[in-house]
Regions:
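Acidic, polar-rich low-complexity tracts and alpha-helical solenoid repeat scaffolds
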Residues: 1-250
Length: 250
């Protein structure tokens, strides 16, 4: 409004902070925007941009939060709050991650944004929480692959199931789903009569997760067929096993 133009940058900024303290982020955003608009090159404007990112995120206005955070990084790339701005960008995606059954594009974007934070701001205080959330988002994507793989397995669409479980083993090997993925591969390969592949998947599972319930199930599954875990053939599982022996896998 015209009236707002009569106030100093600090006065408007203080009003915005007052609204934040009252848990009214939408009202605060309007005042932070006024500071940026009326006093564009001031220190208060700089603070207002990062606070717009924060307030929009509080208000669950994720796109607006990202826009403000990206603007901050563009204007002040060397500033100490740039790491926080990048964290807000990552959080704006992360906080939209839904159940495993939903589309995972937003999860992939969260991973990219966390990766960028860890790479560009390695000494930042936000690296630790970013790494933790990265691992959770990474697990989430692996969970999606597992869900689809189980769906195909249940319907005896074995090649389609194998493709999903293979993706978990190759691309999400540090996730919490890898042991199950290897067991499901044993199930699917045995169902198709691909004995070498089933034994190979069982051997990798035994090498890395010998104490797990999944390995016990695999071992008894193979034993029922008079088989044992052993790397056979020349396929993709042999390559994985070679990496295991060299300590390059898991």
């Amino acid at each position: 409004s015209d009236e707002i133009e009569n106030y100093s940058a600090k006065q408007i900024y203080d009003r915005a902070e007052y609204e934040m303290a009252r848990s009214k982020p939408i009202d605060a955003i309007a005042f932070f925007s006024d500071v940026e608009r009326l006093y564009p090159y001031s220190e208060w404007a700089k603070r207002s941009v990062i606070m717009q990112a924060f307030a929009n995120h509080k208000a669950k206005q994720y796109k607006e939060a990202r826009d403000a955070a990206e603007r901050y990084i563009e204007y002040y790339p060397a500033d100490e709050d740039s790491a926080y701005a990048q964290y807000i960008i990552a959080l704006s995606y992360y906080d939209q991650i839904e159940d495993i059954g939903r589309d995972q594009e937003v999860t992939a974007k969260a991973l990219q944004a966390f990766k960028k934070l860890i790479k560009n701001y390695p000494d930042s205080e936000y690296v630790k929480p970013a790494e933790l959330k990265f691992d959770l988002a990474f697990d989430h994507l692996a969970g999606k692959e597992m869900e689809v793989g189980r769906y195909y397995l249940k319907r005896q669409q074995f090649p389609a199931a194998i493709n999903r479980f293979r993706t978990v083993v190759e691309d999400y090997q540090t996730s919490s789903y890898t042991a199950e993925a290897l067991h499901r591969l044993v199930e699917a390969y045995l169902s198709m009569g691909l004995v070498d592949e089933a034994q190979s998947a069982g051997a990798i599972l035994g090498h890395n997760y010998q104490a797990s319930a999944w390995y016990k199930r695999t071992f008894s599954l193979l034993r029922n067929e008079d088989l044992s875990p052993a790397v056979k053939g020349t396929g993709w599982l042999r390559k994985i096993h070679r990496q295991v022996l060299k300590g390059r896998w898991l």
